[in-house]
Amino acid sequence: MTKIEWTEKTWNPITGCTRHSEGCLHCYAFTMSKRLKAMGLEKYKNGFELTLHEKELELPKRWGKPHMVFVCSMSDLFHSDVPFEYIDKVMNVIRSTPQHTYQILTKRAEIMSKYFSTREVPDNVWLGVTVESQTLKWRIAHLQEIETKNVRFLSCEPLLENLGRLNLDGIDWVIVGGESGPEARQMKEDWVLEIKEQCEFQNVKFFTVYAETRGSVSYN
C-alpha cells in the first residue's frame, strides 16, 4: 500500500530522477531513495540515479483485484533519459491489465505530449502534470493537447505561490497540497481557496492533501 492519499498502490519500473523545477527542492523520492540504499535494498543500490527495472514490469499482473496505481512515484516516467521504447513496455503492461487504473504524473509535460502524439493513451490511464508555480502553468497546455477520453489531472503540490487564473478546459481533477517537514516552504490558505473556487466555477473536482499552511485547510 501507499501513504499517498489519492491512490492505492505504487508501481516503480523506474527509480531515480534529476531535479527539474522548484517543486523538486525537497523531493520525497530523493530522500527515500538515499534511505533505502543505506538500508541495503538491492533495488535502490544506485540511490537516486535513474535506473530502469525490467524485472518490475510484470508486477501489476500479479495483483488480483483492481487497484488505483500510481506509476513511478520514485521517478518520472517521462524523464528525458527514459527511452520511448521502455515507456512502450510500461504501456503494454498497462494495456494487458485493464482491471487496474493507472495514474501517471509528470513534470516533463512536453515529453509526455510528444510521446502520445504518435501513440494512443491506454483506456485505463489517467494523465497528470505538476504545476507548482505560475511560471509552470504552460505544462497544462501540453496536457490539454493530448487526445484522451480519460481523466486529466493537475497536481499543485507543493503549491509554492498563487497560481492566478487557470484554464481548466479538459481537466477533470486538481490536487492541491503543501510541503511537510522542518524545511517546508509555507503554502498560504488563500492560494488554495482561489484554486478551489476556480475548480467549482469550471466544474472540476478538487482534492486537498496534507499541507503546511498559514491557516488551516480542510475542504475535501
Residue ranges and their predicted role:
Residues T213-N220:
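C-terminal accessory extensions appended to soluble enzyme cores
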Residues M1-F70, D76:
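N-terminal [4Fe-4S]-dependent radical SAM core
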Residues G16, G23, G177-G178, E212:
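Glycine-centered flexibility sites
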Residues E8, L25, L41, K45, ...:
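Generic intrinsically disordered, low-complexity segments enriched for polar/acidic and small residues
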Residues L52-A211:
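Conserved AdoMet/S-adenosylmethionine-binding subsite of the radical SAM
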